[in-house]
Structures are given as C-alpha cells and as structure tokens.
Amino acid sequence: MISYEKSKTILKKAKIKIKDETIKSINSLNRVVSTNIYSNINYPAGNNAAFDGYAINSKDTNGLKKKFPKKFKIIGSIAAGMKPFKKKIKKFDTAEIMTGGIIPKGFDTIIPIEQIIFAPNKKYILIDQKIKKFDHVRFAGSDYRKGEVVIKKNTIVQPNHILAFK
C-alpha cells in the first residue's frame, strides 16, 4: 500500500491534459476558462442612472437657495433598455429616469427619487440647492471596457462573468 504522503506527491506530479472545447456561454457556469476572455463591448454602453430619480443639468442648480426653489419641467421618462432620449434639453428641464436608463446629452446628474419634491401639479420638480455634477451616474465602460481582460485564464466561470460573454 502507498502512504498518504507518497500518494499526495504522485497526484501533484500527475499532469492530466483535458482538451479545450468551445461551448455556449449559457453552459459555461462552473467551467474553467482555458484562455483569457476579452470584452468586445464597453459595459455599460453609455452613462446611466445609478438610481431611480430625475436627470438634470447640474449647471442649472448654480446659485439655488432653500428659500427660493426653482421649478424644473418634467419633459419625459427614461427606462432602462430604452433607446437614447432624443428630445432637445432646455435650461431647467428634467426627465424621470429609472436605474440603468441611459442619461441623455444635456443632463449630467441624477437626483434620487427619495430626494424629489414635486410641484403641486406634478409637471415640475422643485430644487432648492446646488446639485453636484455626476452625482449618481454610472459611467460608460465603468464595469469593463472593450479589449479589457474580463475573465483570466484558469478562472472558474461564475454567474457574474456570464454578462461579459455578450
């Protein structure tokens, strides 16, 4: 009989070569990646909302004071997965935006829904303070960028890796 220590040594020295294979990403969970996997997209594709709320241009809040709130006109709604918003953004415009919604050009900041004060007619929101630029924004490519290694060779595929296979 072989001792425990000797058997460990034999197993450590043994080399088993398993053939590489190409499989569908849906079948890759708990499999070992044989080469580095590179992203072929930026993810997220565009700047998007980190929270449900309202998109604004932070410059429109310069000089605002608690005693003198400014009305921002609600011009639409943006859901995650929607095509980019094409409306022309004017000064003091805002748009409702859901988490993951792409932020249209002209807006640069998200105010979370919990912080929103609506005008009585619900066609406007009221803002009474300076809002910092890029608050609650997830930037394009912040998870991973095109050409970046997203899964290293010899990594066991986990659920969070599968999105990178797009």
What are these language model-derived features?
Residues M1-K66:
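Short, low-complexity N-terminal leaders and the immediately following helix N-cap/first helix
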Residues S58-K166:
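Short, glycine/charged-enriched hinge/interface segments at domain edges or termini
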